[in-house]
UniProtKB/Swiss-Prot annotation:
Subunit structure, interactors included: Component of the small ribosomal subunit. Part of the small subunit (SSU) processome, composed of more than 70 proteins and the RNA chaperone small nucleolar RNA (snoRNA) U3.
GO (cellular component) term, any one: small-subunit processome
Localization terms from the record: Cytoplasm; Nucleus, Nucleolus
GO-annotated biological processes: ribosomal small subunit biogenesis; translation
Name the record gives this protein: Small ribosomal subunit protein uS15
Amino acid sequence: MGRMHSNGKGISGSSLPYNRKPHAWTKPTASEVCETVCKLAKRGYTPSKIGSSLRDSLGVAQVKNVTGSKILRILKVNGLAPTIPEDLYHLIKKAVTINKHLQRARKDYDGKFHLRLVESRIHRLTRPYRKNGTLAPNWKYESNNASTLVA
């Protein structure tokens, strides 16, 4: 899928291995991986950071191959899932950063333009999340309250 507000085509990307079984050299069991996922989530790690740290420290390439369920599902079962989806959270964080910059530099028209792009991306992303129930149906992004969502 191409980029929304730029000329990038989005062609490059990695593909998952065909064999879905955990590698023979993978040492941790499913229960150990689940415990580690919960421990890292309690420390405040996002699901993608959890996956990266499991890959780097324990050698778990794909959590789903070892445990049978994805990281976010493990977090939901244990009640540790984030309230706002990760991609939306990072977009809101970016909008808050640009907003803080614009309060110091009011004449930055390029920054204002990019803030509009980020906010439109946020609005477009919230629609499917509201429809499938990830977010509340009356959830709405407001730039005034965005810093409380990210904090």
